[in-house]
Amino acid sequence: MAPPHPRDPSTAANYEQVTVSHYALKWKVDFEKKHIAGDVSITLDVKQDTERIVLDTRDLSVQSVALNLNGEPKKAGFTLEDNQALGQKLVITTESLKSGDRPVLEIKYESSNNAAALQFLTAEQTTDRVAPYLFSQCQAINARSIVPCMDTPSVKSTYEAEVCVPIGLTCLMSAIGQGSTPSECGKRTIFSFKQPVSIPSYLLAIVVGHLERKEISERCAVWAEPSQAEASFYEFAETEKILKVAEDVAGPYVWGRYDLVVLPATFPFGGMENPCLTFITPTLLAGDRSLVNVIAHEISHSWTGNLVTNFSWEHFWLNEGFTVFLERKIHGKMYGELERQFESESGYEEALVRTVNDVFGPDHEYTKLVQNLGNADPDDAFSSVPYEKGSALLFTIEQALGDNSRFEQFLRDYIQKYAYKTVSTEEWKEYLYDSFTDKKVILDNIDWNLWLHKAGLPPKPKYDSTPMQACKDLAAKWTTEGSEAPTDGEVFAKMSNSQKLAVLDAVRVNKTMFGDRMPALTATYKLDQAKNAELKFSWLMLGLETKWSPIVDASLAFALAVGRMKYCKPIYRSLFGWSATRDRAISQFKANIPNMHPITVKAIQSLLK
């Protein structure tokens, strides 16, 4: 029997005594003050007798707290106590609450004008330069900066919301829209939402902006600023097709709608799996649908992450490792098993190896699958490790068991068993053993301690390396001493985007043998003209790593234009580490801080410590 979940270290909430079943939000979005003001009614379930309720906050101004136990709200005393990197604890003293009580907390408050979850953009900072824009990013522990809450994945709740925004703007949330009405003053619009499926706090999300909607199917649409609407519709036209394949792999889709919204370039991630409304970076708008693998990833989160959720951020791999594995299962069904094998090997070699060896170092705590976060902000540990090391473990297990269809059925059963719940690594492992009692000897041969609790690289799974070898062979023509570099770019041009990336990665791995061939590589493969952001990023990184001075201006411009941390953090790391570019890069970064997302600012500032 798996042990009870240990306490989530990233929250101060007393969720062992009291839990939240529902949030009812009434918000007013103020673009001038750059904050959200309003109130929240929090329905509680008391599990153990208590005389206090503890919620997470960060930089909130709390005006009043009332507790409604028997239909009559009574003013409650409260204090805000510092909780270091985790914000402030809102400690509410109550009359004696008994197990089984269902009181409602009523809190009036407002966010600060630098809430960690929010980015307010002026009209000039948006793509169309027509109207201001707001979007949120609550993962991992930033929901507490826009609502007092139990900000832990261990607590799942439904929510409803009424959001008042300036007239002419559209509001979207991670919920099902219930329509809109004009405000009494006629200058604002009130949008209503309901999320009937219980979700963790990090999946609370809001967007407000000048947006246009394009229908993809009965349950899928894409939202974007009008100038990007057609391009977004073209890029993501296969969303319904991907969703249907995902249902074949993982089971029924329970969220009603699957909409996408293309955010401004400052959005710090590739995508964010907010229920009913996936947030997407505009860097995916390649014009040829070559980066829609991110959509398969975010769709997969509808089962692993959103439906079955890691109980704490120390077990983040249960969200992301499973989701990467499902994403590649979907691609295997759509494009063939060889493509799944290739993507899996690419993830191991291009992302995991580099993160472990070059970013953290092989002995670092954050290269473990199950991590000890202590009082650290979980964002500090964010990397490709839970994604790729987690996926590699599942690939290894599937391979060892030798029955892909049975392992796929296990995944569906696992999702069904833990749907609407949270799960620990020990619970998952116990369920794995219970599902394969006839394969215990095989499972026992897996070095669980090495995979789950040891730092560094795990053993590389046995992939079919046929497509990868073709990429390495082409790269070797650029990096083998005495070889003649290719002058014909046709072979490269005919490759898929993921194969092109593998070629450049293989060159980067062997860059010491690359010599002064950067100008020739750039010209032969027309890399300076790349519209695909992944390809352009790999080219820029190769140029920086080989200290090719003509790449500097393009690298600085890319880091300035793109807020996605996957790109700008490594670019700034390289620029900061090169004496010839350090001062210029620091100057650009500091000057651009007002235009950047706070999550991105914090991540890049950490490189300067």
UniProtKB/Swiss-Prot annotation:
Its cofactor is Zn(2+). It is found in: Cytoplasm. The keyword Iron does not apply. One of its GO terms (cellular component) is cytosol. The active site is at 298 (proton acceptor), 387 (proton donor). Zn(2+) binds at residues 297, 301, 320. It catalyses: Release of N-terminal Arg and Lys from oligopeptides when P1' is not Pro. Also acts on arylamides of Arg and Lys. It is an enzyme of class 3 (hydrolase). InterPro entries: Aminopeptidase_N-like_N, Aminopeptidase_N-like_N_sf, ARM-type_fold, LTA4H_cat, M1_LTA-4_hydro/amino_C_sf, M1_LTA4H, Peptidase_M1, Peptidase_M1_C. PROSITE patterns: ZINC_PROTEASE. GO terms for biological process: peptide catabolic process; proteolysis. Transmembrane segments: none annotated. Keywords: Aminopeptidase, Cytoplasm, Hydrolase, Metal-binding, Metalloprotease, Protease, Zinc. Its EC number is 3.4.11.6. GO terms for molecular function: aminopeptidase activity; epoxide hydrolase activity; metallopeptidase activity; zinc ion binding. Its main location: cytoplasm. Binds 1 zinc ion per subunit. Belongs to the peptidase M1 family. Despite its similarity to leukotriene hydrolases, AP-1 does not have leukotriene hydrolase activity. One of the mammalian leukotriene binding sites, 'Tyr-378', is replaced by a Phe residue in AP-1. Aminopeptidase which preferentially removes N-terminal Arg and Lys residues from peptides and proteins. PANTHER family: LEUKOTRIENE A-4 HYDROLASE. This is Aminopeptidase ltah-1.1. The lineage of its organism: Eukaryota, Metazoa, Ecdysozoa, Nematoda, Chromadorea. The gene is ltah-1.1.
